Amino acid sequence: MNKTFTKNIPVNEILHLGEHLEYKEGQVISITIAQNERLSITLFALPKGEEISTHVTVGDAIVQILDGEAHIVVGDTEHNVKTGETLIMPSEVPHSLDARESFKMLLTVVK
């Protein structure tokens, strides 16, 4: 019997991750793919107008934009991150994400 360490998503298939969640007006949608004490991988969909307010994480946070464009503030630096682009937010630095346009992302936090 094979043991799988991921959840909520098919294994041994070619995937377009952004197709596994939909935008819902007024809601931030998330699907956890993997999580343990050293790693967290989560899909997010933020419709236009939603945000993830300023916070810090223990661990580097790697954001990969799958669809749309995210406005991300890391410390005092602002970024507009578009489809296909990646931004690494260092551990324990305050950051926030704003959907000036709808976007989907894959978030990987490594501790």
Q: Which residue ranges define each predicted feature?
A:
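Ligand-binding loop in jelly-roll beta-barrel domains
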Residues: 91-111
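A cytosolic small-molecule/anion-sensing beta-strand core signal
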Residues: 37, 66-67, 82-83, 101
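A short, N-terminal "cap"/entry segment at the start of jelly-roll beta-barrel domains
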Residues: 1-38, 73
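Glycine- and acidic-residue-biased ligand/ion/polar-headgroup-sensing regions
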Residues: 59-71, 75
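Conserved short histidine dyad/triad with adjacent acidic residue
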Residues: 26-27, 37-57
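Short acidic-glycine-tyrosine-enriched beta hairpin
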Residues: 76-91
